[in-house]
């Protein structure tokens, strides 16, 4: 997570998104079992639930900042931005990562899958048809 300031400062928001996804993949993979337990506990423990909610909120803010930069540069339609943020939030979630790694798929491949799906979502948000 120490790479976040550098990633968010990337002048190319599309590149920044790809790099941000790499950061999340590395984070989710670093201590996968512990994070899975925390998410499980968070479902029944209000304090852990608040911590997970706060982390997800920070992730949404980072994604929103990148998407807003894409809108400002003309890469994404303004009307498509809210939905794009929601899709990117789902794609970068621990739950999505855990599903893709559950069968033993390597983290590098999972990261590439998430990056490709995210790039596709951005392309869809840039076109006139969704």
Predicted region positions:
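Secondary-structure edge/capping motif, primarily at the C-terminal ends of alpha-helices
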Residues: 35-42, 99, 103
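Hydrophobic alpha-helical connector segments
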Residues: 1-30
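Short linear capping/connector segments at secondary-structure termini
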Residues: 2-7, 38-46
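Short coil/turn helix-boundary motifs
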Residues: 10-11, 31, 45, 103, ...
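Amphipathic alpha-helical packing segments from all-alpha helical-bundle domains
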Residues: 22-39, 46-73, 82-86, 111, ...
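Hydrophobic/aromatic-rich alpha-helical bundle segments in the mid-to-C-terminal region
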Residues: 71-117, 125-130
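Alpha-helix initiation/capping motif
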Residues: 6-13, 41, 52, 56, ...
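Positions in alpha-helical segments
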Residues: 2, 15, 36-37, 50, ...
């Amino acid at each position: 997570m120490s790479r976040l300031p550098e990633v968010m400062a990337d002048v190319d928001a599309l590149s920044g998104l790809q790099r941000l996804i790499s950061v999340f993949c590395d984070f989710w993979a670093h201590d996968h079992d512990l994070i899975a337990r925390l998410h499980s506990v968070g479902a029944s423990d209000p304090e852990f639930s608040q911590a997970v909610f706060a982390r997800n909120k920070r992730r949404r803010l980072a994604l929103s900042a990148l998407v807003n930069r894409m809108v400002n540069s003309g890469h994404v339609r303004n009307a498509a931005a809210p939905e794009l943020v929601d899709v990117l939030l789902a794609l970068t979630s621990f739950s999505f990562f855990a599903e893709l790694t559950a069968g033993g798929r390597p983290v590098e491949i999972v990261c590439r899958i998430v990056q490709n799906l995210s790039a596709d979502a951005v392309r869809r948000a840039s076109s006139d048809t969704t």
